[in-house]
Amino acid sequence: MFYFSHLLRDEEMKEVIQETGMGVESIEFSIAENLDNFSKTLLSYEKRLGKMGCEKLLLHGPFLDLNPVSYDLSIRNVTMKRYEEAYQAAKALGAKKIVYHTCYVPDFYLLIGWAERMAEFYREFLYEKDNSIELVMENVLDRIPQPMAEVAEKIEHPAFGLCLDVGHANCYSKVSCEEWFQTEKKYLKHLHLHDNKGDRDSHLPLGTGTISGNVVRGILQEEQVKTCTIECSTQEAILASFYGAKKLFENKRTDNREEKQ
C-alpha cells in the first residue's frame, strides 16, 4: 500500500488522493505545539482528513529535541510523553502505523550500549500495548544499519519493526542502500521513498538521483514490507515517484506470477 507525506496544501493532498488512491502519512502530531493542544488539533485534523478524502492513515511521530536513549531522565521522560501522545493520536484517528526516528546524532552519541538503551526504552513504551498499531523506527543521520537491527532483535513485540528510509541511507551513510536493506530486511515493516544525489537530503522524485531502481524494486519484493511512503514536497514529484514505484511494484507481481508458472 502506497502513502505520501502530508507536505502539500490540503487541496493538493485531495487531488493526489483522488488520482492515486494513496493513503497519507501525517506529520501533524510530530509538532510539539500541536501536541500541547492535543484535543483541538485532533478534532481539527480529523475534519481536514475527511475533506481530503483520506481513508488510510499513518502518523509520523515527534523527534525534534527528543532522545529515547538520553542519560538525562527528564529528557527521556519528555520523549516518552511525546511518543505516547502521538500514539494516542494514532489510536484516535485509526492510523495503522506510526514512525519514530532513532534520534541518533553521529560524533555526538556513542554507539556503545546504544542498542540496549533503545530497546529498554521501547520495551517500556510498548508495555501493555497490543499490536493494533505498528511502531517502526526510521534511520535519519544513522551511518550504519547494524545498531537498528540489534534494537529490533532485542525487542520481542509483534508491533515493533524498522522503517528503511532509502534517501537518508543514500546521503548520510557510506553504506549502500542494498546493504542497509540486507541488514534490516528481517525486521522491515515500512519504507520511505525519495531520491537524492548523495550530497544532501533533497527529497527528489524517484529516479532523478543516485538510488538504484533495482534496489528499490528488491525491497518492494519483500513480502513483509507491505507499506511505503513517498516523501517528496511537490505534487509533481509525488506523482512521478508514485507512478515510478508502482511500476516497480507491478514488475514484482509479474515476476512472482512467472515464478509460479
Outline where the language-model segments fall.
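Charged helix-capping and loop-helix junction motifs
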Residues: F38-S44, I75-Y83, G113-E120, A149, ...
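Active-site beta-loop-alpha junctions enriched in small/polar residues
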Residues: L7-R9, I27-I31, P62-L64, C103-V105, ...
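A short acidic, helix-capping loop that chelates divalent metal ions and anchors anionic groups
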Residues: D65-S70, V105-L111, C171-Y172, G198-L204
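N-terminal pre-domain/capping segments
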Residues: M1-E85, Q146, D255-Q261
